[in-house]
Amino acid sequence: VFGKQFEKIIKRSGAKAGDDIYISNVLGLGKQGYEKYKKQILDLPNQYLKPKLLSVKTIKALQPYMSSAIDVSDGLLLDLSRICKQSKKGAVLNILEEAFINTIDDLVAGDDYVLLFTSNSKHSESIRKTLPTSFLIGKITEEENISVMDKEGKNLNFEKLGWDSF
């Protein structure tokens, strides 16, 4: 691993029960880009071929507010499960509270490279000011499982959580 350490290292293991769960931007653009790529439709900027990442400046500005973080490369649910496992916590996601996905499949598709992070709720206003494209998508729980709730409050089940190379 290469890189320069900022003042504080944000690990996957830092999530605490009650923390808010955020993503830095909408999900599904990687999947849409891949579908266009397969059909040789290359007329628009393609998030699959050239993901737009957060700037170092933005990440440094968010750093004081984050308790844990991971990039969403293998699917939101799988990458969230990695934070939960490392933190020995669980999560509840409310997927239809805000329009951060186009379809349910966007939760497991991957290749989005948005930042998934947790933060104490007292920082919500600062996060919105620092990263206006972010979405508050759920809460970290003490119970070690992940629940995904639809707008009626029903728990959704998934056969797979995302892309697993192993």
Feature locations, PLM:
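Helix-biased detector of long, well-ordered alpha-helical tracts
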Residues: 1-166
